[in-house]
Amino acid sequence: MVEMLPTVAVLVLAVSVVAKDNTTCDGPCGLRFRQNSQAGTRIVSGQSAQLGAWPWMVSLQIFTSHNSRRYHACGGSLLNSHWVLTAAHCFDNKKKVYDWRLVFGAQEIEYGRNKPVKEPQQERYVQKIVIHEKYNVVTEGNDIALLKITPPVTCGNFIGPCCLPHFKAGPPQIPHTCYVTGWGYIKEKAPRPSPVLMEARVDLIDLDLCNSTQWYNGRVTSTNVCAGYPEGKIDTCQGDSGGPLMCRDNVDSPFVVVGITSWGVGCARAKRPGVYTATWDYLDWIASKIGPNALHLIQPATPHPPTTRHPMVSFHPPSLRPPWYFQHLPSRPLYLRPLRPLLHRPSSTQTSSSLMPLLSPPTPAQPASFTIATQHMRHRTTLSFARRLQRLIEALKMRTYPMKHPSQYSGPRNYHYRFSTFEPLSNKPSEPFLHS
């Protein structure tokens, strides 16, 4: 026994060193440990993900103190050993840290479980809930939040950090096939969330198409991403809120979380894709909360250069019409979304004198390098100005025509958050969560 003590001491020290290294979760981000050879089809009535397929996936569970049970409500993405990224609307009704538990490394979860989790799962408490300062509970604007984990989670074979976009990467290309994951409902009116983690392939959808008359009719803002299919059938649903929308450039690239599951009309309906909070618009905010160094560790080392052929948000010149020109629709829909004016590009076939460009004298020829640099600066300046103008118009419209709270409307409402409400276990199916 005396001879074994040094060996035991060495083993204990080695384990402690490995645990210390893993606790930081500073390893490569966005890497999958396992993946399904069938490449999952959908979350709604679809394919289950394998254990370790999405190691940054987190289950946010509501904790009931009287019976110590935990009920899955939202998803989230692990940033590092201290922070989880999720949606702000998950905390509309449960704002206290002691109302929540976090489960990492899970493929299966038990709804209403009152026993400790088993390996490789890890359960943690929430130390702090950080909701975006400009989050709007009615319009769902700035639907993003961070959770401080306590004690820090340990990364390993089934738990690892996600990647976030690089500052220089810009919006992903369209068309682009991405993935969504979650434990949400597998159909629109399911009795409770899925017990197994589901994965789905979805296509990014151009924001102008998503905002067209037959789709969301301008209710998607410039800080959102639309993903799904025109015919529906594959989509996120209640209980998937806060979970990631993930894309990668090629099979050798890490997955990057480009969106946070936010809202939608129903689940898997035609021309009603899922709407996600665009993460690249909130990188500065995330860095201000978790620290710039922590953000840098989860950004890909070689960002993909932004594209101008298929931009995520199509650029349109600012309209010459004043902000008050854009009025609300005559009949307000029963589901509430922020209204964004659709700024249309004048057609190239139009020959009206009011649209003809003014003639200007020719300018002297410039070197090629100077011309390219000037065009790049003008494009960035114009795009920035257009986005600021668009957001100003949205803000003015909200002040001039304040949106009513959903409770002030009568009749059926088919707008749903992707948040799963919890109810005590019973044989009676629960209805999808309706904000009121």
UniProtKB/Swiss-Prot annotation:
Naturally occurring in which organism (per UniProt): Mus musculus
Record carries keyword Protease: yes
GO BP: acrosome matrix dispersal; acrosome reaction; activation of adenylate cyclase activity; binding of sperm to zona pellucida; penetration of zona pellucida; response to steroid hormone; single fertilization
Protein name: Acrosin
PROSITE patterns: TRYPSIN_DOM, TRYPSIN_HIS, TRYPSIN_SER
Peptidase S1 domain mapped to chain residues: 43-291
Cited Gene3D superfamilies: Trypsin-like serine proteases (2.40.10.10)
Cited InterPro entries: Pept_S1A_acrosin, Peptidase_S1_PA, Peptidase_S1_PA_chymotrypsin, Peptidase_S1A, Trypsin_dom, TRYPSIN_HIS, TRYPSIN_SER
Keyword Membrane in annotation: no
Subunit record text: Heavy chain (catalytic) and a light chain linked by two disulfide bonds. Forms a heterodimer with SERPINA5.
The organism's taxonomic lineage, starting at the top: Eukaryota, Metazoa, Chordata, Craniata, Vertebrata
Signal sequence segment: 1-19
